[in-house]
């Protein structure tokens, strides 16, 4: 939507300066193969569907009432699955909302917060929105995070692990190095993709009072359409997040989302099976693309980051779209020759590979 300068006179000065996050395309055309926003190619657990139907058919009258502001049942399910105390769990309307509360709760300090120069592009948006000072730390020549760069003075650290869009993961030992180097500020590990092969930092929670781990049900649990995210930390940090939440939106998760997420956490076998299917498909996709001449960064996510020395990435993305396949292209320095490709089903991945082989390369 185009807004004139005259119309912008009603906007606050801060909003006029905002550079909002640009979400991945959600196409209106139904027959496109969508490999651009890292959604799970498989449906959620059948128990999730049953739980949502039960809310509609057995608790319809309760829809006139507000949901549990604390989402107690969901916190209990997460705590049980993660083997932690309920007081160490915070939930929100997707991990993006949880991250926003994290920025507000912990990062308004005199020193800049640190995060990689190539990472989740919501971080600079939140920093601008909340007036947080920032310092972007360059990835090394292999697009890896060098944890030694995070030992300088700062007002907080946030790292996506595995990183996005590069898909490369840090080890737990490397995460501990960051925590030990920053005992007086909060270190946030954003684990949106951790269930596809990386090591979770949740196991470190009780050892580090400055650690916050943020996760989501959107990727590995196939619940992107319901918006459920959560943070895990020691209770004194959770209390700060609860204070921010209750100053912003006391009822962030609706009854359907609570019921669905609880059911997902209770079906661990289905969760593990689907994650393994994605991992297996990812490894095959990497092999197939490598045979076509792509260089693929080592992935621990449900997507890959790939470049081809003989073909411009932007043109490849456009040609794929013309063939009905959408991937994510970032026209940004250092990564403007890479494509981020969501791992689909084996059939979807085969279509991508065959299209590249027969019609494009």
From Swiss-Prot:
<dbReference type="InterPro" id="IPR050106">
    <property type="entry name" value="HistidinolP_aminotransfase"/>
</dbReference>
<keyword id="KW-0368">Histidine biosynthesis</keyword>
<dbReference type="InterPro" id="IPR015421">
    <property type="entry name" value="PyrdxlP-dep_Trfase_major"/>
</dbReference>
<comment type="similarity">
    <text>Belongs to the class-II pyridoxal-phosphate-dependent aminotransferase family. Histidinol-phosphate aminotransferase subfamily.</text>
</comment>
<dbReference type="GO" id="GO:0030170">
    <property type="term" value="F:pyridoxal phosphate binding"/>
</dbReference>
<comment type="subunit">
    <text>Homodimer.</text>
</comment>
<keyword id="KW-0028">Amino-acid biosynthesis</keyword>
<dbReference type="GO" id="GO:0004400">
    <property type="term" value="F:histidinol-phosphate transaminase activity"/>
</dbReference>
<comment type="pathway">
    <text>Amino-acid biosynthesis; L-histidine biosynthesis; L-histidine from 5-phospho-alpha-D-ribose 1-diphosphate: step 7/9.</text>
</comment>
<keyword id="KW-0808">Transferase</keyword>
<dbReference type="InterPro" id="IPR004839">
    <property type="entry name" value="Aminotransferase_I/II_large"/>
</dbReference>
<keyword id="KW-0663">Pyridoxal phosphate</keyword>
<dbReference type="InterPro" id="IPR005861">
    <property type="entry name" value="HisP_aminotrans"/>
</dbReference>
<dbReference type="InterPro" id="IPR015422">
    <property type="entry name" value="PyrdxlP-dep_Trfase_small"/>
</dbReference>
<dbReference type="InterPro" id="IPR015424">
    <property type="entry name" value="PyrdxlP-dep_Trfase"/>
</dbReference>
<dbReference type="Pfam" id="PF00155">
    <property type="entry name" value="Aminotran_1_2"/>
</dbReference>
<protein>
    <recommendedName>
        <fullName>Histidinol-phosphate aminotransferase</fullName>
        <ecNumber>2.6.1.9</ecNumber>
    </recommendedName>
</protein>
<dbReference type="GO" id="GO:0000105">
    <property type="term" value="P:L-histidine biosynthetic process"/>
</dbReference>
<keyword id="KW-0032">Aminotransferase</keyword>
<feature type="modified residue" description="N6-(pyridoxal phosphate)lysine">
    <location>
        <position position="219"/>
    </location>
</feature>
